[in-house]
Each structure stands twice: as structure tokens, then as C-alpha cells.
């Protein structure tokens, strides 16, 4: 029964993206517009041996570009990117369903997932945006944290969950860092709960496991760019440039006010 639900959700996600993700959908062969076209251009360039951030520049994280590159490696066209989108959204929908099942029965949970994904149509734009990939890395911590709170509220937060939160946060950070803020909120609530309960040791271990999770994802990425000789370029584009961009935007708003 669970397998049937997962297959249905996967097919629904494929149909949704085929209609809504105009930049990558096989139904829109010649469509090219928006941020997605930039991401695919850089992804295609990577698949042809070019270096992101030095040969081509954009201020998104490397995971986004290498997912696009993987799509072009797979098929040589944007169809590969569409396939990767389908995988990510399908997995996201499954974790949405698993989360909903904590509170509702099967049919109601499926409806919740469908409504949520349909609501995503208002922000998907032309598809293949950073949020689309980060949703999976956000849904995993949401599911795990809610599962723990509802199933085992009186037990310490599992350390392996905190490690997973760290990995997911790093994944979001290396796509678009502000997309991972929600995960930071989950960790913060967990730590506040530990301090209120006077479980200082638990709080320390939770922080440690979260940091280890971040390092588990961040270190291989940084080593990869270090070997390529473009680590400083990647850090500047992914983090420094965006902090500068956000700071300048805030300054302009304040001066305008």
C-alpha cells in the first residue's frame, strides 16, 4: 500500500513539473528564459569542462550548478535536468506524506501533499530554481523533528537526527544559504528545550553533532574546489557576495526610509 502511494506521488510530481517547469519540461522544447536558463548554461559548461565561478559566474552555490551539470552529463540536454527535478520533488513529496501520516490517515495525507505541491505552482516560476532542490533538505529535518516530538516527546533528541540536520543545512547553504534558515530554527528550538530542561550535556552533544553534519557535507565540497584551485572563488560567490548583496539591500532600504 505504501509503495502504491509513493508511485502515485512520483507520477503526480512528474506531471506537475512537466506542466509547470517550462524551462526544463520536454513539453516546452524551445523555451528559454529566467534564472533557470543561467543555471543550465553553467551546468552545461561544467559538463563540457569549464569551471564555475571563474569561467562562468553566478552567486548561487555549487550544488545547484553541479545538479544541472549532472543532468547534461546524463542526457546531453535539459531533459536530464528535468529528470533530476522529478527525483527531488518526488522524494520531497514522500517526506511530506510521511510527515502528514503522523497526524492523518492515508487519503487525507495524500490530499495534503497534493494541495501543498499545487500551492508550489505560485512560486516555481519557470522551474529549476534553488528552492526546488532545497525543499528536500528542509523536509527531511521537518519530518524527523516532528516524528521525535510526537512519538518520543520525553526522550532526548536523537543525536543522529542532529547530524542529519547538519548535512541538510550544509546542502542548503551550498545551494542558497537563506533557504536553510528553517533548519537552524529546528536546531535552535531543540537547544532551547535542552537548556530549559537543564540538559546542558545534551545541548553540547546536539551542537557537536550538528556541526559534524555540516562538516561531513562541507569538507568534501571545499576539498573539491581546493583541488581545482577555485576554492576562494566559490566561497566568495556562494557566501561573501551574497552577504554583501544583502547588506547593501538593507542599507538602501534604510536610507530610503
Role assignments for model-derived ranges:
Residues 1-23, 101, 159-162, 205-212:
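Start-transfer (signal-anchor) and selected internal transmembrane alpha helices
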Residues 160-177, 183-190, 216, 221:
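Membrane-interface alpha helices of multi-pass inner-membrane proteins
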Residues 141-164, 196-198:
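Membrane-interface transmembrane helices that cradle and orient dolichyl/undecaprenyl
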Residues 96-118, 135-136, 153-160:
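Transmembrane-helix signature of polytopic, membrane-embedded enzymes
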Residues 62, 66, 74-94:
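Loop-to-helix entry region of an early transmembrane alpha helix in multi-pass inner-membrane enzymes
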Residues 124-134, 229:
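Short acidic/glycine- and proline-prone juxtamembrane loop motifs at membrane-interface regions
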Residues 83-103, 140-144:
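Transmembrane-helix motifs of polytopic, lipid-linked glycan transferases
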Residues 182-215, 223-227:
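Perimembrane helix-loop-helix junctions
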Amino acid at each position: 500500500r505504501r509503495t502504491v502511494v509513493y508511485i502515485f506521488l512520483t507520477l503526480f510530481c512528474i506531471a506537475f513539473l512537466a506542466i509547470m517547469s517550462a524551462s526544463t519540461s520536454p513539453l516546452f522544447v524551445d523555451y528559454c528564459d529566467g534564472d533557470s536558463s543561467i543555471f543550465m548554461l553553467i551546468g552545461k559548461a561544467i559538463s563540457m569542462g569549464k569551471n564555475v565561478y571563474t569561467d562562468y559566474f553566478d552567486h548561487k552555490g555549487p550544488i545547484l550548478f553541479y545538479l544541472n551539470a549532472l543532468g547534461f552529463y546524463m542526457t546531453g540536454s535539459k531533459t536530464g535536468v528535468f529528470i533530476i527535478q522529478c527525483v527531488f520533488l518526488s522524494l520531497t513529496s514522500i517526506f511530506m506524506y510521511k510527515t502528514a501520516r503522523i497526524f492523518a490517515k492515508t487519503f487525507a495525507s495524500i490530499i495534503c501533499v497534493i494541495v501543498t505541491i499545487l500551492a508550489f505552482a505560485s512560486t516555481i516560476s519557470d522551474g529549476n530554481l534553488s528552492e526546488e532542490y532545497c525543499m528536500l533538505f528542509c523536509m527531511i529535518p521537518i519530518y524527523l523533528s516532528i516524528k521525535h516530538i510526537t512519538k518520543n516527546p520525553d526522550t532526548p533528541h536523537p543525536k543522529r537526527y542532529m547530524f542529519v540536520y547538519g548535512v541538510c543545512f550544509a546542502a542548503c547553504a551550498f545551494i542558497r544559504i537563506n533557504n536553510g534558515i528553517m533548519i537552524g530554527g529546528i536546531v535552535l528550538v531543540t537547544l532551547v528545550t535542552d537548556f530549559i530542561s537543564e540538559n546542558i550535556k545534551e545541548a553540547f552533544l546536539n551542537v557537536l553533532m550538528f556541526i559534524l553534519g555540516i562538516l561531513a557535507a562541507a569538507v568534501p565540497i571545499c576539498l573539491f574546489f581546493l583541488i581545482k584551485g577555485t576554492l576562494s572563488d566559490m566561497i566568495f560567490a556562494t557566501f561573501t557576495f551574497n552577504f554583501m548583496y544583502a547588506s547593501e539591500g538593507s542599507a538602501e532600504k534604510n536610507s530610503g526610509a
